[in-house]
Amino acid sequence: RLPKGKPFFGQIQLKGGKTKPRNLSDNEKTDPANVTVPADYPQNDLYRRVVAKHCDTIRSEDKVIGAILAALKEDGLEETTIVVYFSDHGANNLVRHKQQPTEAGLHVPFMIRGPEKWVPKKGQVRNDLVSILDLSATTLTWAGIEYPKWIEGQNLFAKDFKPREFVGSGRDRCDHTIDRIRTVRTE
């Protein structure tokens, strides 16, 4: 347990789509017959099973996250703790998603929960284009540290926050293959 009244930083790395669903009973698992396979993939049983497993993995991780949030509440930390959930890449279940700078590879979950002082407008959904650099600027602000003006990120909750017109991304290698790709994403 955490010491009472002291600030803390914790990082919990979940395995995401890199593992089998751990905590779902058979009756909780997704029926492959009920999933939608993206149009650019073969519409067959193999891909339906892959997509169903991915759905189950997400639900399995949801349970783990729920347990973490419940523990924070039980310890009286729910109203004083900021929780940030994000991924380092998009979907991991199909070819071209994880390692390619495409919409499927770049669109990541990004959720923040915390006290209103730091995370205003509880339950708000924003569709702004953001960069992981923005998370750096935001967390420095939460810690009371002024971030350098040269940093390319911005505090997502600042009064003067300006939505980005575009975000850039890239890939330099995939495993042992050098393959430099750059992208620009706009609305």
Language model features by range: what are they?
Residues 1-133, 140-150:
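Active-site-proximal cap/lid insertion segments
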Residues 89-93, 133-136, 143-187:
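C-terminal cap/loop subdomain of S1 sulfatases and analogous C-terminal strand-loop tails that border
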